Amino acid sequence: MLKVNLSVPLRFPPRPSALKKMTQPIPPITLPPPENPLLEGEWLRERLQRWLDTEFIPEAVNQNIAQRAAQIFVRQRMEGENDLGSLVIAIVTEMQSYDFSNSFYGEFAIANAVSDLLLESLGIDKCCGQ
């Protein structure tokens, strides 16, 4: 027998104007050219380790993870990469070879955390890109 939950509101298809907004590409977020990539890397390492330690529990492996992510970030920045999306992809790709077996985290969580920290530093809302 089919049961219908009447407490759930009916969902209608979005209006054409809303649908058009949903199909618009998300504009890229570009970081300013690096003035001191090593200093940026140290800032990122410290912030990422603090985030890792706060998110679950402080672990020795968090320092290694933050150091590795910061190294990738610095190298990418020194090679001229300023696009946030490309930086995130580079971190995901290169962190895949990292052994996360002693951690609660994985490469996607690390790349997303880096993205959030960078957006926050730029004053961009993580939720809505504004």
Regions found by a protein language model. Give the residues of each.
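The transition from N-terminal targeting/processing segments to the mature protein
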Residues: 15-130
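N-terminal chloroplast transit peptides
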Residues: 1-22
